[in-house]
């Protein structure tokens, strides 16, 4: 099964080439890889041209959301997978995804990989902090032997949805550029389209070098919490807790249900309404 991978990148060539090497080495199927290159003056643009990679381009950094939407315009498969440029995909990652996709009779699902990182992943396991000191054998052995369960309530990259669903929600909301709050907003839009399967696939593991692009660059982040609250009436934490059940430890047990109001939820709702009023002032 062919998947269209969309990958925004901003002068991060060393990590990007490492990411691409993992796809070449560890994919069972041939996939469409689409970059969106922001700036590219570090050699990324020339690298893409010389290697005949498929890409869209902007002279400056247009933000995560706009980058993803630009790249997605070129997608020609039924499934779109968004990935970071500083990830390393495990062996047979696509086989695990395809096996999962084949379980569904409709397209109302959102599937994600399991982030492994030094100290900021769903699973914390040190295999290195850069491509140069990455212990690939250690990562492979960990992926082979780990018995973690699939989890409930995912809202993070890498994530896959059907192309029709992507179009239905209009991709990523560009008012969240440069990107803070964009993932929960995307999931909220899917929720409003009756998606109730938000599932993390344990076997589909990626090693993530901790959002290197955002950390290294002097990028002024937007206030995603404020924008999300003004848009939906509650903040991303409330959405993750009561809708997605996504605290990173809930084992997947089927499609989610609409949240039922209890005393704790009601108190949080009142607090969120006060925050909403504060943001509106």
Which residues are covered by each model-predicted region?
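A short, conserved alpha-helix in the catalytic core of glycosyltransferases
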Residues: 96, 152-161, 165-170, 176-204
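C-terminal, non-catalytic tails of nucleotide-sugar-dependent glycosyltransferases
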Residues: 110-113, 125-151, 155-160, 197-198, ...
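Cell-envelope/extracellular polymer assembly enzymes that use nucleotide-activated donors
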Residues: 2-4, 32, 185
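Short, acidic, metal-binding catalytic loop of nucleotide-sugar glycosyltransferases
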Residues: 21-30
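Short aromatic/hydrophobic "clamp" motif used to bind/position activated sugar donors
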Residues: 80
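Conserved donor NDP-sugar-binding/catalytic core segment of glycosyltransferases
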Residues: 91-129
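Glycine-rich, basic loop-to-helix element that forms the pyrophosphate-binding segment
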Residues: 58-75
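A conserved acidic beta->alpha catalytic loop
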Residues: 29, 37-46
